[in-house]
Amino acid sequence: MDRDTEAGSNDGTNDNNDTTIPPHTPESNIEAVDHVPPVPRRPSPKLSDDGASGALHVAAASRPTTQVSTIDISTLSFPDGSRGTFSTSATSATSATSATRSVASPQSSASGYTSPRTDLVETVSVASYPATLRPPGDLADLVTGEFNRRSRAWSMLRTQSSSVQPFEASRTGACDSLTGFEKEFDNIPELGEKGITDEQRLSLWKSKMKHYMILSSAGKPIWSRHGDTSLINSYMGVVQTIISFYEGAKDPLLGFTAGNARFVISTQGPLYFVAISRLGESDAQLRSQLDALYMQILSTLTLPTLKNIFVHRPSTDLRKPLEGTESLLSSLADSFTKGSPSALLGALECLRLRKSHRATINNAFLKCRSDKLLYGLIVAGGKLVSVIRPRKHSLHPSDLQLIFNMLFESGGIRAGGGENWVPLCLPAFNNRGYLYMYVSFFDSVETAEENNSNNTNNPEQPPQPPPPKPVTSPDEEIAIILISADKESFFELKSMRDKLALQLAKNGSLALIQSAARQGRPRIETILNTKPLSKEAGQGQGQGQLSHFLYKSRANVQFCQSSLSPAFETSSPPLPSSSPSENGSSQKTTEKLVSRRRLMTLYHHLHASIHAKHSHLKVLHLVSEDAASLAWITPVFEFYCVAGPNMSSGIMTQCANKVVQWAKREEERLFIIGGGVF
């Protein structure tokens, strides 16, 4: 009873005791009455007597600490692409007015309590409404993210601007990362040669941007791209100690970084392969290069021979069994350092020919085929022209890479001239045994005489195409490669070669092959049907165009690329020399070398980014101060391209679509689909 009286005396107006206690219920009731007390009202703000200023003060005091500042932050896009942020003073008065209006007389709510007329106090910690949601012109709000909007004046100015070729800033800048790359392939002099000291030799060795080392698990040096044994012996010992330490802990060392150099280690049985690079390549790319060096060793020794050597004597010096093949290892390593699209994409490059012309060559190849033949290849300047193979058998690109390196990079076989009979292990085909390769280069003088004699002996025969011109470049050399499993088939394959050379000379195929090789790779402006970029500043096209591209057909494991001219055949101005005529050709070669490496470094970065382990990217667009680049991956093809830094993403995408459509139209000319099968 006392409790009921006490409850009834409560008038419900006290802010500190606003709850109502339910009355006592008799025990006869099964359940107690569940009366939910109302939520206490929020204290209403008390306005001061000083008008608007007091209202502003109370409004500011009542705001939660999580409120976003009401300062109007906007961005301005400048013509050079940069942006700046600033606060607009014109809207400060508006903000003040809105803040003044935010505090008004209270109004009653549905719950029976009073609350402010506006919802600002209730919702300010939940949402913020910036004043520049839809800015005009170059103004873009930070929240909307419209950073790429351009004014009409800027768009008109852009169409009149000259196209900038890729890497122009790097070519003239003092902080070029490839400074001194032209000396990368210079041999380190012997101790005492030209008065050079051991410290100078060590300095030259450390200045190299890329190193490859091969050593045995016992620490015996086998091969190194730079430096002789006396120079690198101690370093190989350190490398062997580090690798062995991690292997003893059952945690093999795969790679590490020291300064700006990346160390990647690959263990293949009793051999350790080490790559040291300052060229920005990924671990996967460096490891694939080390695998290629391992394949080169297997092509000389075969896997069973290599195992037997180290099973009986783990400390065997492998330099003696590999004697004479150092040039093959060096040329293969140098191709990686210069930048090899074939190694990067794991694909082959084919010579562009008409489908009918390639079919004619394949038919002539098959007609002259010997029973002892396993594979037959015609190669022009490192590009595959024709291949005949057994049904359901094909050569792996890594095996063909070893063959092309032997023929066109090392120069050993070409320097010998005439015909060559080479025992060779193709590891991807069979790493346990040898095949025998007959190699012969077509002599243009010989084929010209054959053409003339055929026309003289057969006056009724229709006139033949003009004979091939003398070879003036390694890219125009044509070689025939006949592979057999029979080591006694040299003369039979030689006879096949003679018949094939005569047949190709009669139908004019040799001239067509040499003409296609001399024509070179397709140019960008021809594919896009645009005007070529001028080398002089200010002469470029306003819309710009691609400078280079790589296109890989995944189904055919082949790729094509555009010509490096003109964007990547010029570099920094020529160095001053006392004899310009003597230094002209070497300077041009150096410029091409550095430009090619700069381009391939960007391609390596693109390839590594889009093929990252946990990446699911299909299209990647990168823009830097030097260049704009694009990578596009589908189940059918891989596409990579490079353009100048001022090229917009829209125009770059349009050009990429045109190139992809062109590649699909020209697929049977660009790639060998199937080849000759017997």
Swiss-Prot record:
Q: What's a Pfam family in this record?
A: Fuz_longin_1
Q: List all Pro residues biased stretches.
A: 460-471
User: According to Swiss-Prot or TrEMBL, what is its membrane topology?
Assistant: Peripheral membrane protein
Primary location recorded for the protein, binned into one broad class: membrane
Enumerate composition-biased segments (Polar residues): 63-77, 106-116
- Protein name (database record): Vacuolar fusion protein mon1
Q: Name one GO cellular component term.
A: Mon1-Ccz1 complex
Q: Where is the composition biased (Low complexity)?
A: 10-20, 87-105, 450-459
Query: Which cell locations does it reside in?
Result: Endosome, Multivesicular body membrane; Prevacuolar compartment membrane; Vacuole membrane
Q: InterPro entries, alphabetically?
A: FUZ/MON1/HPS1_longin_1, FUZ/MON1/HPS1_longin_2, FUZ/MON1/HPS1_longin_3, Mon1
Q: What does this protein do?
A: In complex with CCZ1, is required for multiple vacuole delivery pathways including the cytoplasm to vacuole transport (Cvt), autophagy, pexophagy and endocytosis. The MON1-CCZ1 complex acts at the fusion of vesicles with the vacuole, through its regulation of the SNARE complex during the coordinated priming and docking stages of fusion, and particularly at the stage of tethering/docking.
Identify the species of origin: Neurospora crassa (strain ATCC 24698 / 74-OR23-1A / CBS 708.71 / DSM 1257 / FGSC 987)
Q: Where is this region: Disordered?
A: 1-116, 449-474, 568-591
- What processes does the entry annotate via GO biological process terms? autophagy; protein targeting to vacuole; vesicle-mediated transport
